């Protein structure tokens, strides 16, 4: 059954809900804490001028996850040799209490729908990357249409994947 969720811009009074979300213990090495992600977004915006879109993932009024999308990330271009002018799902997590219920798949669909509005400019692709050991993320990303780019994968790096827009 499809879960009715929505993405919300993170406002000051909602920030605490987002920073309290946690993944399972065995997933902690795969994603940064949400507080760290919000700090990263702040510095990317203020120091590098990168367009960053952090969203809370909500089921009704209940925060169940976090996703952060960026546009034209110089570090991804550098590490993976990606083209300029692309969207990048920089961070994505579903709280441990809500995993396995369809929230992740639906949240990614909503994020892709948002990206296809081209809020920061036109692009041909949306990229993301994940740890090679993170089979759950890999399976989810492939289900929603991302294609692994193993030709760009380097040892000790995350695996890049692309979705044509």
Positions of PLM-derived features:
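Active-site acidic-Proline motif in GNAT/NAT acetyltransferases
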Residues: 95-97, 101, 132-133
């Amino acid at each position: 059954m499809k879960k009715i969720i929505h993405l919300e811009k993170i406002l000051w009074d909602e920030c605490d809900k987002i920073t309290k979300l946690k993944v399972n213990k065995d997933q902690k090495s795969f994603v940064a804490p949400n507080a760290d992600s919000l700090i990263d977004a702040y510095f990317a915006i203020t120091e590098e001028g990168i367009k960053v879109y952090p969203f809370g993932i909500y089921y009704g009024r209940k925060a169940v996850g976090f996703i952060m999308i960026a546009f034209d990330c110089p570090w991804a271009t550098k590490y993976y040799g990606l083209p300029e002018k692309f969207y990048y799902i920089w961070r994505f997590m579903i709280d441990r209490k809500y995993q396995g219920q369809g929230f992740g798949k639906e949240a990614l669909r909503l994020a892709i729908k948002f990206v296809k509005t081209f809020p920061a400019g036109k692009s041909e692709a949306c990229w993301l990357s994940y740890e090679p050991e993170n089979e759950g993320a890999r399976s989810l990303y492939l289900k929603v249409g991302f294609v692994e780019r193993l030709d760009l994968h380097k040892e000790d790096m995350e695996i890049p994947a692309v979705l044509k827009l």
